[in-house]
């Protein structure tokens, strides 16, 4: 199931650093995490959907790069973000 406009706005509002912020690293990572979680659920049902699996791997790689950047530039924001998202177990 695709992400609705309302769900996307909710995530943006929750992770925005200031009003109108849609492109900060935190927002990008949060949106990618939402998409990754949705696609993971899809792949549990449709195990042979290799095309979507490749898309999942690409999204995970993009999120990894963004998180690496954030950790390098501002470790405190990085730690707060991973705790809020519940990733990096």
UniProtKB/Swiss-Prot annotation:
Molecular function GO terms recorded: rRNA binding; structural constituent of ribosome
CDD domains: Ribosomal_S15p_S13e
SMART domains according to UniProt: Ribosomal_S15 (SM01387)
Keywords assigned by UniProt, alphabetized: Ribonucleoprotein, Ribosomal protein, RNA-binding, rRNA-binding
GO CC annotations on file: cytosolic small ribosomal subunit
PROSITE patterns assigned to the protein according to its UniProt record, in alphabetical order: RIBOSOMAL_S15
Family statement drawn from the similarity comment of this UniProt entry: Belongs to the universal ribosomal protein uS15 family.
Function comment: One of the primary rRNA binding proteins, it binds directly to 16S rRNA where it helps nucleate assembly of the platform of the 30S subunit by binding and bridging several RNA helices of the 16S rRNA.
Protein name: Small ribosomal subunit protein uS15
Species in which this protein is naturally found: Thermus thermophilus (strain ATCC 27634 / DSM 579 / HB8)
């Amino acid at each position: 199931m695709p992400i609705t406009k309302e769900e996307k706005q909710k995530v943006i509002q929750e992770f925005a650093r200031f009003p109108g912020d849609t492109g900060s690293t935190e927002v990008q990572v949060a949106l990618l995490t939402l998409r990754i979680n949705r696609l993971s659920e899809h792949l549990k049902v449709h195990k042979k959907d290799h095309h979507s699996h490749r898309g999942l791997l690409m999204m995970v790689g993009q999120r990894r790069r963004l998180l690496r950047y954030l950790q390098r530039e501002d470790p405190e924001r990085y730690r707060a973000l991973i705790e809020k998202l519940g990733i990096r177990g």
